[in-house]
Regions:
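A conserved pocket-lining segment of Rossmann-fold NAD(P)-dependent short-chain dehydrogenase/reductase
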Residues: 161-182, 190, 194, 206
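N-terminal Rossmann NAD(P)H-binding glycine-rich loop of SDR-like oxidoreductase domains
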Residues: 2-27
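Mid/C-terminal beta-alpha module of Rossmann-like enzyme folds, strongest
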Residues: 190-253, 275-294
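NAD(P)H-binding glycine-rich loop region in Rossmannoid oxidoreductase-like domains
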Residues: 40-42, 46-93, 98-101, 113-117
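SDR active-site strand-loop-helix element
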Residues: 10, 34, 69-73, 107-113, ...
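Conserved beta-loop-beta element that borders a ligand/cofactor-binding pocket
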Residues: 130-151
Length: 294
């Protein structure tokens, strides 16, 4: 009987990774998923490990035995730079330090299209994590663009749902790099292929959609598809910077963190589009159709 390949997944309870794991043949793969909280998680064939990426003692034995590691755990929004580097960079380094030198597993790292020196603390922390990953024998780095189609109202998904009913919409002015949004199902397919179908190793995949939008172009497209008037209010960079400073001082969450300004205005990579099965305009059209039918 062929031994199952052992797979260790961080950030396993995220919507993205749950969809990846749903595609895996658990007759062939023995999967352990690391999660901050395993409440209400019930996926057949998956061993859930409650723990923290920063505490390697909690998951050491599973990493040592692994043939494949998918690292998706990350912090994306924080008021302090230290949080980004503790989780995204140092957490990745601690995970890698657990790997057996004899086993040499495939390491698939879910990074970000904004990874870079000019992309604020988040972007730099992801870039430093990538550098750690690329020291390994077998690795794939995946840099997703803006992902839509999930159930959480955040990022571009929040922008879509805020704008789809029309009204006044705030729009950052002067952002040069366009968004190239990609549907969650297409993102899932690429991650699955990288980990379980053994695509070319030791490569960085910039994962983006085929159509680019500035923030203003996105709002105008939503207006056209929805048929609802949108009043666009341009917000200059200096004002966003001020909001970032204020957000750091306030004790409550205002939905904006200091490093988002640098992240927003940084130059981002773009490559030939991945296979796209759901275009953004069609996706928005379906939302509008459901609203009208409801």
């Amino acid at each position: 009987m062929t031994r199952k390949q052992r797979v260790f997944v961080t950030g396993a309870s995220s919507e993205l990774m749950l969809q990846v794991l749903a595609k895996v043949d658990t007759e062939r793969f023995d999967i352990t998923g690391l999660t901050r909280s395993k409440n209400a998680l019930d996926y057949n064939g998956i061993r859930w490990l409650e723990g923290d990426i920063q505490n390697s003692e909690q998951y050491l034995k599973f990493v040592v035995e692994s043939d494949i590691i998918i690292h998706a755990a990350a912090i994306t929004h924080s008021k302090t730079q230290k949080d980004y580097f503790d989780v995204n960079h140092e957490g990745t380094r601690k995970l890698i330090s657990c790997i057996s030198k004899e086993k040499k597993p495939l390491f698939v790292f879910i990074s970000s299209r904004v990874a870079g020196e000019e992309s604020g603390a988040y972007g730099v922390s992801k870039l430093r994590a990538e550098e750690e990953v690329k020291k390994l024998k077998k690795w794939v780095v995946i840099r997703p663009s803006e992902v839509y189609g999930g159930t959480k109202s955040e990022g571009i998904e929040k922008t879509i749902h805020d704008a789809i009913n029309g009204g006044v919409q705030l729009c950052p002015a002067g952002v040069e790099s366009k968004m190239y949004p990609i549907h969650i199902s297409d993102t899932v397919d690429v991650i699955f292929e990288a980990a379980f179908e053994k695509i070319k190793e030791n490569q960085t995949i910039v994962l983006n959609g085929s159509v680019g939008y500035s923030f203003k172009e996105l709002l105008l497209m939503i207006e056209r598809v929805s048929g609802r008037k949108i009043t666009i209010v341009l917000i200059p960079r200096w004002f966003l910077g001020l909001v970032g400073i204020v957000s750091k001082l306030l004790p409550m969450d205002i939905g904006f963190v200091p490093d988002q300004v640098a992240r927003l205005y940084s130059k981002k990579t773009y490559t030939e589009a991945a296979k796209t099965t759901v275009e953004l305009e069609s996706y928005i059209g379906e939302i509008v159709k459901r609203q009208n039918e409801g």
